[in-house]
């Protein structure tokens, strides 16, 4: 599988007691080289999004479905997802977040086991395995399409309003 082509396992990082877990699809080249999730340009944008929402990278937990980089930056294959999904589920059981933020269509379709468009899933509360989930654009998509940033921010605001309600905290 992917173990033969990767440099590092990119398991995830952040607060193991986080109330928010951010999930992408798979590590990219920079993440594979460093062994850390979301460290390239997409990660820098994710950090800015989190900061705008009132969180630091250290307060949340950030991971991907796949723990190894697919060659050529391709989408994960079904057997790779089946191999890695138990690791993601164990991470979520240990952390037990209040909210999960899924980044992008591939991550959302994979986790929710559906084929819906990103537009049909974005910005609204979805429940999966007892977790409250929100879906927005992947930061890499925002870098390619800056006009989507407004929609992403609306999604993040919806997530934060929900977070404030369930955690009894004021936000935004």
What are these regions (language model features)?
Residues 1-172:
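A polyanion-binding, active-site-adjacent surface
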């Amino acid at each position: 599988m992917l173990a033969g082509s990767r440099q590092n396992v990119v398991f995830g990082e952040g607060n193991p007691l986080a109330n928010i877990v951010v999930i992408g699809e798979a590590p990219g080249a920079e993440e594979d080289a460093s062994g850390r999730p979301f460290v390239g340009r997409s990660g820098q944008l994710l950090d800015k999004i989190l900061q705008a929402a009132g969180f630091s990278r250290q307060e949340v937990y950030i991971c991907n479905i796949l723990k190894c980089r697919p060659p050529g930056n391709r989408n994960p294959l079904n057997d790779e997802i089946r191999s890695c999904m138990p690791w993601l589920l164990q991470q979520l059981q240990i952390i037990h977040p209040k909210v999960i933020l899924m980044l992008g269509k591939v991550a959302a379709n994979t986790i929710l086991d559906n084929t819906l468009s990103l537009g049909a899933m974005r910005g609204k509360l979805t429940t999966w395995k007892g977790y409250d989930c929100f879906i927005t654009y992947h930061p890499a998509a925002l870098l390619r399409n800056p006009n989507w940033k407004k929609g992403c921010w609306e999604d993040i605001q919806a997530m934060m309003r929900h977070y404030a309600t369930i955690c009894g905290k004021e936000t935004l």
